[in-house]
Amino acid sequence: MLETLQVLIAEDDVDAVELYRVALEARGHVVTITLDGRECVDVYTKSMQRLEPTNRPSSQPYDAVILDYKMPVVDGLEAAKEIMRLNPQQRIIFVSAYVKETLMDSVRELNQVTELVQKPFEPDLLVDMIEDTSTVSRLGELNQLVSQISIKSGGSPDGSQFEILMQLLKKIQKTGTI
């Protein structure tokens, strides 16, 4: 049996967030829902403050944070930046209709590739992705490549390098979500 995962979701579409919640809870996971990026960061910050090192072996309050890329108040990218400042090891998964833009922004702004799910998608696809924790280590390897590209080029990857990153991310994410 898979361990129970703690998942924080920020999504302004209440119908979509309900689908995510039902799919995750059906597999025994604990879900915390927020409706915008500001609320998500506030909930995450409070969870970090309550976290004791002995509570969770990973020393992070959530196994995954799911962020809608385009949200009111604070968008997903800004929320991710704030969360990553609090905990650089936090697993972030963007849900977005704009995967290329999201990938480029995550590399430029977060200095790393994050997992992506292209809207629309079946909620079970997201659950499968969250449960596949092997993706995290493979993403770490991909992010080492991003760091090397950034060091060599003195900045962010160029257009052709983004295409390569997109292809590598597709291979890492076995679910074919992008």
Model regions and ranges:
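Conserved acidic carboxylate
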Residues: 11
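Charged docking surfaces used in two-component/phosphorelay signaling
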Residues: 18-26
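Acidic catalytic/metal-coordinating carboxylates
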Residues: 36-39, 75-78
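Active-site beta3 strand of CheY-like receiver
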Residues: 51-66
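Active-site residues of response regulator receiver
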Residues: 68, 96
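Receiver (REC) domain active-site loop signature in two-component systems and cognate sites
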Residues: 71
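Alpha4 helix (beta4-alpha4-beta5 surface) of REC/receiver domains from two-component response regulators
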Residues: 78, 85, 99-116, 124, ...
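CheY-like receiver
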Residues: 128, 135-178
